[in-house]
Amino acid sequence: MDTRVTMVISKYGIRIKKKINAETKPHPSSNDVDEEIFNFLKRCGYNFGVKFPCSIIKDLYSMLEGDNDIKVVTVTREEEGIGVSAGAYLAGKRPFMLIQSSGLGNSINAIASLLKTYKIPILILASYRGHYNEKIPAQIPLGKALPGMLNAMEIPFLVLEKSLEPLETFCVKMFSSSEPHVVLLSPELYENE
């Protein structure tokens, strides 16, 4: 079986593109991707989540709300979630955020001025809107600009388009560097071949 992985690496971000042949199993369904992320969060000891509503990762929200080991808080603005996550970390929790990439754009200053300045390692999982088969035109400008914005702010990020495999290694790097890391979850993850 021939599987090719292409990595495009900038100073702060890694984009993974995995090309698969016909012998490779199809992309997991939406629920499979969300379940893999849920299992990753549990396995890595995350125990506090901040979420902002998003239709793409709604199945993951349901899984988290039904779990007794992870406390999940819904916020009304993503910047609010940055502050809540920072407070949870300082209180001894291992927090993560689930948001849309548009909200990530709104939160860049809070991430840089709070999380980066005080070396708070928050995992930010964002559904990556505006770059792949986007049906809402208003999402496209930020979707195109987001990787450049993250690079400019020196915020490490990873774009997952076909597989969740690089996620664990990326998070190990986050904790060893004590700084926030962003994972952009492409809609491609949620498609079936």
Where do the language-model regions lie?
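Thiamine diphosphate
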Residues: 4-193
